[in-house]
Amino acid sequence: MIDRINADRLAFVVHVGDITSGRGPCGDQWLEARQKQFARFKAPFVLLPGDNEWLDCKRSGFDPLERLAKWRELFCIPVKELPLERQKGKYCENVRWQHDGFVFAGLNIPGGNNNLGDDPAEHGERMQAVLAWLDESEALARQRDGLVVLMHANPFLVRPIGADGYQEVRERLRRLGETMPGKVLLVHGDTHRFRDDEPLPGLRRVEVYGWPHIRWAKARIERTGARLFEVELMPQ
């Protein structure tokens, strides 16, 4: 797939997380091998964390926060030929860049109910940083042509019982859709299917495939059409 993506002339490539399965492997060797694999991309490459590479590593006997620290060590690095801004402090995985008049904001919001049930303190501290980053990105985007929000989790999953780890970000997305209608695109993964819809008024959502469907989606800015982005699901 990397070879097929490299054959296209892309401004950048984004992976929205889950670079291993929900049961591992989670060790350093696996992550380092993925780092070398991603280095093959010709276009600037941005990686966001999914739950499989830190939260779910508890199933393999790892400490999730230690695995997230290792992820940061390997992947919080400069991105070639892309003016990438990282959030200051320990949440370096929250990123932002601008391209062709649009603001792109990448957030550490993983699946697994965003870790609310297992570690409410971690969830709360991280989400405070995430929401501050999203608010800053929104302020920038209001001076530009629009905003693209990227994360791993599907924030629209309905939980039958228990606390909702995505309520805060969903409310932010609702506000964005209401105040910037048609100018906000949400891209996420997590639930392993392709969707291109409008889950909230004014908010367009694209979910990309996950295992076992190994496919990628290509987006193009299209200012003259009814939608700002043309999204095409590419062959395997």
Residue spans for each PLM region:
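A short acidic, amphipathic alpha-helical/loop segment
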Residues: M1, A33-Q37, R172
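N-terminal active-site segment of His-dependent metallophosphoesterases
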Residues: M1-D28
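Acidic, histidine-bearing metal-coordination/catalytic regions of metal-dependent phosphoesterases
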Residues: D3-A11, F41, L147, P212-R215, ...
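His/acidic metal-ligating clusters that form di-metal
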Residues: D3-F12, Q98, A105, D119-P199
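Active-site glycine-centered loops adjacent to acidic/histidine catalytic or metal-binding residues
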Residues: G17-D18, G50-D51, H152, G189-D190
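A short, flexible beta-alpha/helix-coil linker loop
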Residues: I19-G22, G111-N114, N154-L157
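Residue-level detector of alpha-helical recognition elements and their boundaries
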Residues: T20, R86, V184-H188
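Extended active-site neighborhood of metal-dependent phosphoesterases/phosphodiesterases
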Residues: P25, Q29-A129, D196-R227
